[in-house]
Amino acid sequence: MSRSSSSMATVLVVLMVVSAGGLSPPCAAAAKEEKPVVVLPPAAAPGEAPSADAAAFVRSCCDTALQADRDGSSFCYYHLLPYAAFFEGNQVKVAEVAATILSTNLWVYVDQLRKVQGGAGKGDPNLNACVDDFSVAAGENITREALQSLGRLAAAGNGKRSKEDLENAQKWIKGVEKPYNGGIGKASGCEIGYLFTYSDDLPAQKTLGYTFDTASSLINHIKL
């Protein structure tokens, strides 16, 4: 090969390397935060009532799980009634749908917190802590694992359910509960009660407690 041909080949190799590098994302680029992908079963159409047996089953599940909380039981019932036809007498399916709804509402709430964080709540350390804690609680990996575990528990049936799957779901719901109890880490100052200042900008907070109690109570009533 001539010197000129060799030089040309070298230039082409360099160009190919540079071009390939230009097509790749920079190493320092931050990974995009992903929200968990959750799918609810079809809900009844507005005005469409479930069968009496299906409605009675939802009522029974809610009354049993939230027997000491009449308001919570009522919220649970009307919250889950649109999915009554899906449950087919399976209590774990009820818990699975409640958890799916909670995970969706958590991300709505986190989005609202972040908007306040960039506006009226800028510089508020308690708000910052709550954003951090609820973001961790609603994280993609732990949420996906919990919902997958609930799906397996629902499919397995009584006496065949995995203790590990139940523990995964319980671990997730305990993680969601932590921001209500003063934060996740020792240095965290998340106190949800102090967020009342921003209540007009946090509409999801109005029902988040009931949504959490519904999912938590139903998950903790799952029998292996």
From Swiss-Prot:
Principal localisation: secreted
GO cellular component: extracellular region; plant-type cell wall
Annotated transmembrane regions: none
BP GO terms, sorted: plant-type cell wall modification
Compartment list: Secreted
Molecular functions (GO terms): enzyme inhibitor activity
Glycosylation sites: 141
The keyword Glycoprotein belongs to this UniProt entry's keyword annotation: yes
Sorted UniProt keywords: Glycoprotein, Secreted, Signal
Signal sequence annotation: 1-30
This protein's name: Uncharacterized protein Os08g0218700/LOC_Os08g12160
Lineage: Eukaryota, Viridiplantae, Streptophyta, Embryophyta, Tracheophyta
